[in-house]
């Protein structure tokens, strides 16, 4: 797909020259191999490692409308049918050669099957009724034309050139095929209403498969599905809201410097001349590789080059450069939020939309010299193109499918020039079939067909790796020498831009358009530039979740020298074949897989909910040789004293402690802002599997979840929490005197319930219809009620943040959790069962509103505005799924947890865990509780749980 001889697992598809068209083909090939991707995945995870991680093995079930009956024309087809004039011979054609001798009957049979399979190949057009997809039975029977082998080369060329005469849209004859036995070549001519560049790639692949007797890939959605979606989009308020944007693109009229030449004839195909410019393969490869330096795509560079060429032309004509307006052709397969799968669909999907490139204050001469101005033009081009909504889909929808907006858009003058980048056609197709030329071949068209633009520029990559750029123009308006000169300017601009990118790019190469929408409004372009200087290896800028922002704020506010309560560390004892080098390599692999482990929190934007993912060189793992007498608690204490610098990455580290003949320890340390407890179990399985060489499955990248949370609406969540807490009089404060034995830091009390009590509580929960988590929570809240001295009781609870909707969540690493209040007014007339059921129902309803930050919820409660917390008691029920490593036998690594430490800023926190025997861990602030008082709290919880086993209808 890219022409690269070798591709590493971390190389970007786009850095290798991939584009949006070849991305569609990549998805198609992956699906045929059993890995199901979406096109957007290629843009989000452009390297093989990333795609392998997000791909799934099960194909989605596609429900598609029948490919038959009246069909509304796509926007581009509607322009053609309404304004182009003669339509019968409007076609695209390719010439292909099978790998081996083949009976033309096999080709004919295969083409008949494809016409039956794809509705676009059965289109019929009538002026009175418009487009219609004929049923396979009603469509004309396709017959392959056989070229007389006795014809001379010149005569055969004439026959092939005139093959388009066999097309008849009014009869539904949209496909003509000619088999040239002498050359073993198949010429396919298809009416443009039925085909486009992407469709050719689909068609030729399927033709080769059918001729080889293989099964075709399953179809996605069809033209009827697509046009149903576009029609609904034309009426959608959000899409109509794009009107002003599109009007702004063409509001400043742009004219080519043609000195007022008045054409003597119409601008038709018959009156057009053509010029070809070829950029050699060596320079083309540099051009294809250059955009990645600016996190750009090839179209960004091509439009920048065309803008430079037009700017130079205008400057030489004595005109101000200003802005240039170019119509850009795209493949048009932009399903947006529709979820439509068009990777195997044939049709004319092309989108056409205006792009305004501002060249004000650009030194054109410096740009052509490859100076800083070249970088500024490329940055502007990238920013313009990446800001276009849905890659231009809406322009055609509003111009042609909505009568009101269409009148307004068509009232403005259009761009005089159109650009289309076709990418490369795969020269070697399935089963050795080959294109005879680099792409589309010339077959006669209707000479009277009207052209939409003065200049058409079409770029394509040839079989030799060169870039061929075709320029079409009206002969009576533009001199051939002028076009040749501008074509040279375009080539010079391509070389200048690639030279600039490879040799002396700008220091700031990130733009706000490089960021996901959820983080883009949290940072300015100036601040982004500062981050780029501060973090030269910056790979991504991410939005922090509400809880992450809260943890950062609290860690920063700690007094100098204070222990950070969000510093988590634990120790594992390793067994098996412990190879330090392999452990280090496995650690590196999980840090590469889970980018949140390379998070840094820049001080310059710490109040704005922004984090930076740094390069893989920022992973912290060391192998330490210690004596056999080393004390584990000393190691963990030293690690906690070392702490973390939040501004630096990583906030996650590991130490392999070798202890002579004793089992090694693996000490894992992280700031809580990086991940939650669930994530730790994921990491351990990934580490052990990686050590054993076992492949890791799909996982949800943290930035995806953070982005999804950042884009959730806040107003509905605020309304919910305001209503939920409307009867709350204020924060729930624990009214306890400081114990005489109080000290500093945190202490803990642990208890393990007997197997019998655990079983009884599980039965109680099933009888009442509540989960074990709610059983323990209810007992804890009743104790907190006593400590607070009020029937209004509120505690904080930790929500997992993993809904199960996306199966990749289960293997994701990050801080998914959020801490939010649970409020209840304990009323004596309520039964225990009803009260606990009410708690469970409330928390179930909160699932859709868990993305609001705790401090935002706090402001909705009387007294919460003062800055004091809503509650002083926390509760978490840990029920992470068990994750046994797949590694077994020789070479495997085993790990056993021997120590763990984490803390909280809340004076009282109860943690419940386990299954067969439920465990409880009460963490307490020694400044508020003594050990005896904390032990008494634990005993009260146990006492209430013991009472629950026999209760149900009794009052609270």
Q: Language model features by range: what are they?
A:
Residues 36-40, 118, 122, 204-207, ...:
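Extended, hydrophobic beta-loop-alpha segments that form or line the acyl/peptidyl-thioester binding
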Residues 63-66, 159, 207-272, 321, ...:
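Non-catalytic, low-complexity flexible loops and terminal extensions
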Residues 2, 41-46, 58-59, 121-125, ...:
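A short N-terminal helical cap/helix-turn-helix that marks the beginning
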Residues 84-91, 108, 119-120, 233-243, ...:
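His-Asp-centered acyl/peptidyl-transfer active-site segments
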Residues 29, 67-135, 150-233, 254-259, ...:
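Acyl-group handoff/entry surfaces in thioester-processing enzymes
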Residues 1-84, 105, 109, 221-225, ...:
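Regions immediately C-terminal to embedded phosphopantetheine-bearing carrier domains
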Residues 6-11, 24-28, 87-109, 170-189, ...:
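Gly/Ser/Thr-rich phosphate-binding loops and adjoining beta-strand/alpha-helix segments
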Residues 100-116, 132-171, 240-243, 362-385, ...:
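A short, small/polar-residue-rich loop/turn motif at beta-strand boundaries
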């Amino acid at each position: 797909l890219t022409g690269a001889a070798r591709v590493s697992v971390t190389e970007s598809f786009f850095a290798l020259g991939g584009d949006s068209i070849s991305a569609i083909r990549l998805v198609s090939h992956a699906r045929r191999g059993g890995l199901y991707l979406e096109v957007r995945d290629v843009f989000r995870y452009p390297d093989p490692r990333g795609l392998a991680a997000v791909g799934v093995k099960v194909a989605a079930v596609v429900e598609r409308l029948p490919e038959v009956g009246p069909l509304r024309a796509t926007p581009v087809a509607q322009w053609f049918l309404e304004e182009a004039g003669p339509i019968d011979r409007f076609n695209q054609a390719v010439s292909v050669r099978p790998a081996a001798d083949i009976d033309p009957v096999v080709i004919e049979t295969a083409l008949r099957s494809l016409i039956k399979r794809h509705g676009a190949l059965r289109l019929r057009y009538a002026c009175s009724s418009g487009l219609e997809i004929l049923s396979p039975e009603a469509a004309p029977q396709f017959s392959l034309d056989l070229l007389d082998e006795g014809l001379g080369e010149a005569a055969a060329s004439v026959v092939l050139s005139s093959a388009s005469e066999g097309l008849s849209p009014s009869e539904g004859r949209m496909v003509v095929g000619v088999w040239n036995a002498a050359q073993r070549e198949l010429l396919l001519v298809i009416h443009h209403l039925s085909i486009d560049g992407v469709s050719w790639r689909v068609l030729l692949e399927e033709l080769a498969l059918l001729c080889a007797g293989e099964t075709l890939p399953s179809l996605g959605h069809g033209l009827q599905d697509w046009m149903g979606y576009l029609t609904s989009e034309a009426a959608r308020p959000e899409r109509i809201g794009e009107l002003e944007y599109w009007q702004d693109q063409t509001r400043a009229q742009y004219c080519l410097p043609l000195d007022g030449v008045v054409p003597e004839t119409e601008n038709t195909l018959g009156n057009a001349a053509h010029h070809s410019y070829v950029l050699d393969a060596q320079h083309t490869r540099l051009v294809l590789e250059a955009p990645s330096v600016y996190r750009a795509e090839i179209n960004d560079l091509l439009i920048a080059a065309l803008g430079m060429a037009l700017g130079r032309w205008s400057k030489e004509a004595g005109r101000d450069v200003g802005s240039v307006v170019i119509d850009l052709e795209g493949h048009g397969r932009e399903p947006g939020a529709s979820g439509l799968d068009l990777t195997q669909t044939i049709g004319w999907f092309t989108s056409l939309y205006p792009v305004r490139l501002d060249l004000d204050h650009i030194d054109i001469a410096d740009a052509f010299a490859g100076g800083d101005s070249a970088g500024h033009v490329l940055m502007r081009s990238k920013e313009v193109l990446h800001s276009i909504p849905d890659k231009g889909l809406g322009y055609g929808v509003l111009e042609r499918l909505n009568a009101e907006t269409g009148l307004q858009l068509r009232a403005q003058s259009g761009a005089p020039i159109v650009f289309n980048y076709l990418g490369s056609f795969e020269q070697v197709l399935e089963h050795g079939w080959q294109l005879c030329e680099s792409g589309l071949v010339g077959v006669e068209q209707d000479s009277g067909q009207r052209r939409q633009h003065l200049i058409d520029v079409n770029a394509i990559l040839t079989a030799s790796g060169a870039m061929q750029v075709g320029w079409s123009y009206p002969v009576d308006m533009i001199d051939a020498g002028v076009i040749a000169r501008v074509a040279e300017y375009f080539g010079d601009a391509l070389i200048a831009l690639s030279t600039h990118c490879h040799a002396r790019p700008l220091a700031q190469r990130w733009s706000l358009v490089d960021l996901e929408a959820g983080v883009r409004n949290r940072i300015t372009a100036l601040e982004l530039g500062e981050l780029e200087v501060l973090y030269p290896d910056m790979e991504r800028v991410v939005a922090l979740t509400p809880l992450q922002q809260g943890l950062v704020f609290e860690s920063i506010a700690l007094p100098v020298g204070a222990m950070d309560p969000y510093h988590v560390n634990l120790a594992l004892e390793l067994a098996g074949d412990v190879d330090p080098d392999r452990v280090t390599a496995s650690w590196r692999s999980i840090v590469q897989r889970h980018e949140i482990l390379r998070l840094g929190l820049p001080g310059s934007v710490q109040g704005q909910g922004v984090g930076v993912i740094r390069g893989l060189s920022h992973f912290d793992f060391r192998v330490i040789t210690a004596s056999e007498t080393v004390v584990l608690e000393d190691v963990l204490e030293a690690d906690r004293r070392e702490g973390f610098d939040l501004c630096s990455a990583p906030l996650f580290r590991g130490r392999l402690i070798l202890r002579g003949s004793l089992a090694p320890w693996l000490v894992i340390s992280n700031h809580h802002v990086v991940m939650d407890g669930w994530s730790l179990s994921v990491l351990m399985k990934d580490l052990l599997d990686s050590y054993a060489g076992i492949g890791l499955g799909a996982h949800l990248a943290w930035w995806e979840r953070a982005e999804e949370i950042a884009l959730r609406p806040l107003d509905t969540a605020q309304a919910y929490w305001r209503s939920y807490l409307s009867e709350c009089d204020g924060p729930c404060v624990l009214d306890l005197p400081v114990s005489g034995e109080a000290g500093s830091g945190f202490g803990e009390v642990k208890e393990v319930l007997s197997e019998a009590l655990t079983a009884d509580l599980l039965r109680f929960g099933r009888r009442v219809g509540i989960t074990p988590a709610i059983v323990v929570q209810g007992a804890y809240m009743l104790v907190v009620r006593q400590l607070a001295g009020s029937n209004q009781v509120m505690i904080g609870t930790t929500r997992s943040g993993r809904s199960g909707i996306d199966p990749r969540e289960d293997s994701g690493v990050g801080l998914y959790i959020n801490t939010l209040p649970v409020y209840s007014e304990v009323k004596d007339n309520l039964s225990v069962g009803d009260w606990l059921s009410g708690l469970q129902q409330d928390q179930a309803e909160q699932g859709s509103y868990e993305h609001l930050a705790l401090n935002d919820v706090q402001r909705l409660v009387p007294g919460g505005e003062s800055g004091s917390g809503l509650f002083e008691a926390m509760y978490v029920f840990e029920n992470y799924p068990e994750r046994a490593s797949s590694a077994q036998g020789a070479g495997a690594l085993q790990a056993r947890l021997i120590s763990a430490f984490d803390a909280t800023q809340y004076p009282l926190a109860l943690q419940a865990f386990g299954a067969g025997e439920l465990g409880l861990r009460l963490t307490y602030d020694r400044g508020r509780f003594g050990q005896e008082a904390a032990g008494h709290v634990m005993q009260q919880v146990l006492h209430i749980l013991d009472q629950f086993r026999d209760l149900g209808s009794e009052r609270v």
